[in-house]
Swiss-Prot record:
Entries under InterPro entries matching the protein: Ribosomal_bL36 (IPR000473), Ribosomal_bL36_sp (IPR035977)
Gene: rpmJ
Family: Belongs to the bacterial ribosomal protein bL36 family.
Annotated GO CC locations: cytoplasm; ribonucleoprotein complex; ribosome
Protein name: Large ribosomal subunit protein bL36
């Protein structure tokens, strides 16, 4: 899980979602998981 100020999809499988006002990227590649913080 990477914590960054700007989250962007890295590949075509990355999905940007909002969970309780936290922006997250979920992907089948574990390396691409991100959250905004």
């Amino acid at each position: 899980m990477k914590v960054r100020s700007s989250v962007k999809p890295i590949c075509k499988d990355c999905k940007v979602i909002r969970r309780q006002r936290v922006v997250r990227v979920i992907c089948k590649t574990p390396k691409h998981k991100q959250r905004q913080g």
